[in-house]
Amino acid sequence: MIPEQTNHVVSTIENLPAESISASPGPLHRMRNVFSREMLLSVALGQVLSLLICGIRLTSKYLSEDFHANTPLFQSFLNYILLFLVYTTTLAVRQGEENLLAILKRRWWKYMFLGIIDIEATYLVVKAHQYTTFISIQLLNCFVIPVVILLSWFFLLVRYKVLHFIGAIACILGIGCMAGADVLMGRQQKGDFYPGDSKLIGDVLVLGGATLYGISSVCQEYIVRNLSRVELLGMIGLFGSFFSGIQLAIMEHKELLKVPWDWQIGLLYVGFTACMFGLYSFMPVVIKKTSATAINLSMLTAELYTFFCGLFLFHYKFSGLYLLSFFTILLGLVFYFSTNTYVAQDPRVYKQFRNPSGPVVELPSSGQLEPSVTYTSLSQETEEEPRVRVA
């Protein structure tokens, strides 16, 4: 008996339906993938934070140079009081597990340390202006970038790609270009008056402040992703106002008595507090949308916005290097946001900010733990990233 033969139909490119043949993407399509709406939105949100920092620096400059009101602790204290009035009182009137007392019962000491870190980060950088040059502060402030990247890698389990590192390096090169422009245009006039030991102290203060900023940023990212923005700001307002008030009473009460109060100074304090409150309120939103690393890269443009305003307000000299610096930082941001980071979800990692009195999950004692890697997306791509299993 002859076995029945099966007919096999071979599909070639000629007999496939036209809609099943996808042409290779052209340059315009690739540009749209890179400059997606989500990527442009992420860059724009970071620039809003930079503009708020610009407002903070301009009002501080007017207060210190024109009115001789050197009160950085008092200015921060006003912001913490406003955070307390808005967000801490919101927590106080809530019911259940999100109530202020319930949060304090579970996590009070963690937020206490976060509040102290937030206060001292600002204080160290402001104090460094008395010991070292402005250009040194510009350059050493970039130390916050590797701090945030390392902390995000080890504690938030964020994994980066090559383009992320290229973007970060480009942003730091932009800051270096801006510092070079400051030297060429003579904006640094006090640098020769700082003795070596004094300058070393100032540089150490900047590095310490940048490190504390990095720790604070990573803690904020964890809290807004796992808890809530209102809880974060309410706790910072509570502990920040308490500890900054104590530090103000000890270290700055004499300076506060020397302030020549009038309506102009009052208006500058109001403007500073409004910008600072807006920065603190909006930053958790941007962190949740992007990441702690992304916002610290985005805020590198704040110094350039301050310079551009200074062209009209303080008659700074212009140089094309400032524009080159600005576009170099923006190019670095485009590189950084053009691809997605991903988060390794390891079951061996214990969530430290969770309620320690909650139920304990038993991990299997036998067998090899296989942490998975989950990709997070900042774009509207529909293509799914592969799931990776780590042996």
From Swiss-Prot:
This protein's GO CC annotations: membrane
Report keywords, A-Z. Answer: Membrane, Transmembrane, Transmembrane helix, Transport
Biased composition, Polar residues: where in the chain? Answer: 365-380
Where do the segments described as Disordered lie? 361-391
The topology of this chain with respect to the membrane is:
Multi-pass membrane protein
A molecular function GO annotation = transmembrane transporter activity
Q: What does this protein do?
A: Putative solute transporter.
Give the protein's recorded name.
Solute carrier family 35 member F2
